[in-house]
Amino acid sequence: MVFQQFYLFENMSVLDNCTVAQIKVLNRDKESAVKEAKKYLELVGMIDHADKKPSMLSGGQKQRVAIARALCMNPEVLLFDEPTSALDPEMVNDVLQVMSKLAESGMTMVVVTHEMQFARDVSTRVCFMNEGYIIEDTDPKTMFTNPKHERVKEFLKNYLNN
């Protein structure tokens, strides 16, 4: 799971943030954990920051490290909880590009987001929640061009007019 607030261990390097769970939870040896961490840090464009502490990184960089850390656990499904909501607008695109690459690679992702263009472009299914309930569940084209529920129509009218 990738959270909106990153939750990196501030006292550990980027590399250590990506290896600790592999060693403690998956019982990987350190060498294998480091190899896996470097592979995913490379994928998210953060390998050059492997020795840095999180306090030396921007919000977008921290989020990319959090994505690498999650990938190191070899999940079948990756859950993102508002991965861009805590970022400066300039950093959002970097994170969305990484997520787009993951989608293109076939990674199954469940993404809670307000990034409508991203949802439209990358998703195979889109759910709209209102007051804790899914009120519409369909493909992106239908969701954005012909939604069934009035609340979704209202939301999209406001979104598309801004």
Please place each PLM-identified region on the residue numbering.
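ABC family nucleotide-binding domain
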Residues: 1-140
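C-terminal boundary and immediately downstream tail of ABC-type ATPase nucleotide-binding domains
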Residues: 141-162
